[in-house]
């Protein structure tokens, strides 16, 4: 009973208060900043900007704690069964975010809902609940929470577009970093971690819980395919940007000639 109370006080309550406070106060803060800079703050921005900022907060906290948990905290003896207090907290934190985002995206579906996010959030919530909650595959799950490191770049891209800064050099740099981040972390890093467990870890061949092979054989391919789709979409966007810029420069040069 005491353990449950501690979990509520030191994990559930802070997570709930953080996301609730951000949801309540961020729109007002952003509106003040926008008005001071003579930027319109209409309905879409009132909904999307706070949502993106909260997404960024979640990504920074989750990825930073995941890096610490994976590389600066020697607890991983068995990649499929080892757990730590930090890994449990990370899954609790990101679960609260996904629940929050799912509710907000459903309520403001006109602006926020996408089928890709619905699929991603559903798979993530089921994995963190049934695997993470049972103390299974924390190492593998952390390799995914770590890849949230790319999310702030995606949100920055949205902010730059929304502020009409598509021609700013930062927009190009940001797009390239997103592409590299997705390929490096969301595709290769997670795949390398998964293959290491399957082929190099002795615990996989003797694992008896059916959730482990289900995660590796179904969840991992589904998330990877989704990440590959997003990577393709990003690369297509970058290619279109450079092609358009090149054509525009040629048109200007021809006019000058």
Curated annotation (Swiss-Prot):
It comes from the Eukaryota. Signal peptide: none annotated. Residues 44-243 form the TLC domain. GO terms for cellular component: endoplasmic reticulum; membrane. Its main location: membrane. GO terms for biological process: lipid homeostasis. Keywords: Membrane, Transmembrane, Transmembrane helix. It is a multi-pass membrane protein. InterPro entries: TLC-dom, TLCD. The chain crosses the membrane at residues 14-34, 53-73, 88-108, 112-132, 169-189, 214-234. Pfam families: TRAM_LAG1_CLN8. It is found in: Membrane. PANTHER family: CT120 PROTEIN, TOPOISOMERASE I DAMAGE AFFECTED PROTEIN 4. Belongs to the TLCD4 family. This is TLC domain-containing protein 4 B. It comes from Dictyostelium discoideum.
């Amino acid at each position: 009973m005491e353990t449950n109370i501690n979990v509520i006080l030191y994990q559930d309550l802070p997570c709930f208060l953080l996301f609730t406070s951000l949801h309540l106060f961020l729109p007002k803060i952003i509106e003040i900043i926008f008005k001071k800079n003579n930027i319109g703050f209409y309905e879409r921005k009132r909904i999307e900007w706070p949502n993106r900022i909260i997404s960024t907060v979640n990504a920074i906290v989750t990825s930073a704690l995941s890096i610490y948990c994976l590389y600066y905290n020697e607890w991983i003896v068995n990649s499929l069964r080892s757990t730590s207090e930090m890994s449990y907290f990370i899954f609790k934190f990101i679960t609260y975010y996904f629940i929050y985002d799912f509710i907000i995206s459903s309520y403001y579906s006109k602006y926020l809902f996408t089928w890709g996010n619905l699929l991603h959030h559903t798979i993530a919530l089921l994995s963190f609940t049934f695997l993470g909650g049972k103390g299974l595959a924390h190492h593998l799950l952390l390799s995914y929470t770590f890849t949230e490191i790319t999310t702030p770049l995606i949100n920055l891209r949205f902010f730059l577009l929304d502020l009409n800064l598509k021609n700013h050099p930062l927009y190009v740099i940001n797009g390239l970093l997103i592409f590299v981040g997705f390929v490096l972390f969301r595709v290769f890093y997670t795949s390398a971690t998964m293959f290491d467990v399957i082929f190099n870890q002795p615990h996989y061949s003797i694992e008896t819980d059916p959730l482990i092979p289900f995660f590796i054989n179904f969840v991992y391919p589904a998330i990877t395919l989704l990440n590959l789709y997003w990577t393709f979409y990003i690369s297509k966007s970058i290619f279109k940007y450079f092609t358009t810029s090149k054509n525009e420069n040629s048109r200007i040069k021809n006019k000058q000639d």
